[in-house]
Amino acid sequence: MNPLTQFNKILILPLLIALSLIVVAPARATPSCGMLPPVTLALGHYPSGLLNLMCNEFDSYGWNLKMMVKGDSDVYVIQNTFPAGAHSGWHTHPGPSLITVTSGTLTVYDAADPTCTPKIYRAGDSFTDIGCGDVHLVRNEGSETAVNIVVQIIPKGAPRRIDMPAPGNCPLITCP
């Protein structure tokens, strides 16, 4: 057998496997279900270095701030509306999010939690999402519409949200 032909066969098999994974992986992703389209309330663009912030003037109160961002960033302010039963689908973000529930109750499932214990947030509660590959799902398990406001810091031009497959350690959450 020609060594070049054998070499091409060796290269083609991994290429075909990789291509099949690229085609199949999105089919396993879990898009949102029942949510209203997100509303962008504001979008700001920050050049590299502008989000390098430090404040330790209030250390006497037990508070200081350090934030260092390398590269240009987009900062979004988003409103998400979850009718009863709606969920975000499993997803991640390329950067951190600061979330405040403004009405209703939301339940958050975190894939990194081995027991996938749900965390419940009510109107007035705030929580963070580190993003950067942290896979989670937000669901309205109540009977009234829930709304949250999210501030996201992400690399300039990156998608705000990346759909992910459902993790094996969490309950199966389907679209009602």
Residue positions per predicted region:
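Short, surface-exposed binding/anchoring microloops in extracellular/periplasmic proteins
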Residues: 70-94
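Bacterial N-terminal signal peptides
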Residues: 12-22
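Ligand-binding loop in jelly-roll beta-barrel domains
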Residues: 122, 131-159
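A short, N-terminal "cap"/entry segment at the start of jelly-roll beta-barrel domains
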Residues: 26-74, 117-120, 165-176
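Bacterial N-terminal signal peptides that target proteins for export
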Residues: 2-13
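Histidine-centered metal-chelating micro-motifs
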Residues: 87-89, 107, 125-139
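Short acidic-glycine-tyrosine-enriched beta hairpin
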Residues: 82, 111-133
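Glycine- and acidic-residue-biased ligand/ion/polar-headgroup-sensing regions
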Residues: 93-113
